[in-house]
From Swiss-Prot:
InterPro entries: Cyt_b/b6_N, Cyt_B6_PetB, Cytb/b6-like_sf, Cytochrome_b_N_euk/bac, Di-haem_cyt_TM
Assembly with partners or alone: The 4 large subunits of the cytochrome b6-f complex are cytochrome b6, subunit IV (17 kDa polypeptide, PetD), cytochrome f and the Rieske protein, while the 4 small subunits are PetG, PetL, PetM and PetN. The complex functions as a dimer.
Name of the encoding gene: petB
NCBIfam families: PRK03735.1 (NF002990)
One Gene Ontology cellular component: plasma membrane-derived thylakoid membrane
Protein name as annotated: Cytochrome b6
Cofactor note: Binds 2 heme b groups non-covalently with two histidine residues as axial ligands. Binds one heme group covalently by a single cysteine link with no axial amino acid ligand. This heme was named heme ci.
Length: 222
């Protein structure tokens, strides 16, 4: 993987003595890829790229977004109209969010139709399903953050759905909203989920997902 000029350098020798980077590079570059693999096997990787874009653009917007009922919408308008390239950053965030959900759905279908969930890859499939749920939850929580009419009523409807569950339904609604009605506590909880809980959760399950894929390799043809 490394050229002779690189391997002869002092920097390479320094890292090689301490981390054995040649072995790591060989493991990455010589992994067997089955001949039946085609472009549809790249859908998972495209989903990852979309997430990286989401993380970068979302992080950029946290410098200007204000998660309060009174200022959320005005801060989003400020990002769109006043911040340099703010309109582009938020637009890319929205477009890549839609693309991430689409690629995730197509990836799930590809894995299911090609039997990639079968033994010995059951746990890889389980972590993938968890990642799919987290991805959808990202969309639901992010949709509310502008706190406009669309976001407000979306939160009100989504947070009211658990009320139909027997016994614990009302408690779940209160847990999601932070109170009996939709308000500041609801926005704070959705913002915390969207910017802290979900990113850490998806990072952990992505790591598990990729480690299992590296260990087991790509599934064979049907």
């Amino acid at each position: 993987m490394f050229t002779k000029q690189v391997t002869d350098s002092k920097a390479y020798q320094w890292f090689q003595e301490r981390l054995e980077i040649q072995g790591i590079a060989d493991d990455i570059s010589t992994k067997y890829v089955p001949p039946h693999v085609n472009i549809f096997y790249c859908l998972g990787g495209i989903t990852l790229v979309c997430f990286v874009i989401q993380f970068a653009t979302g992080f950029a917007m946290t410098f200007y977004y204000k998660p309060t009922v009174a200022e959320a919408l005005s801060s989003v308008q400020y990002i769109m109209n006043e911040v340099n390239f703010g309109w582009l950053i938020r637009s890319i965030h929205r477009w890549s969010a839609s693309m991430m959900v689409l690629m995730m759905i197509l990836h799930v279908f590809r894995v299911y139709l090609t039997g990639g969930f079968k033994k010995p890859r059951e746990l890889t499939w389980v972590t993938g399903v968890v990642l799919a749920v987290i991805t959808v939850t990202f969309g639901v929580t992010g949709y509310s953050l502008p706190w406009d009419q669309v976001g407000y009523w979306a939160v009100k409807i989504v947070s009211g759905v658990p009320a139909a569950i027997p016994v614990v339904g009302d408690q779940l609604v209160t847990l999601m909203r932070g109170s009996e009605s939709v308000g500041q506590a609801t926005l704070t909880r959705f913002y915390s989920l969207h910017t802290f809980v979900l990113p850490w959760s998806i990072a952990v399950f992505m790591l598990l997902h990729f480690l299992m894929i590296r260990k087991q390799g790509i599934s064979g043809p049907l």
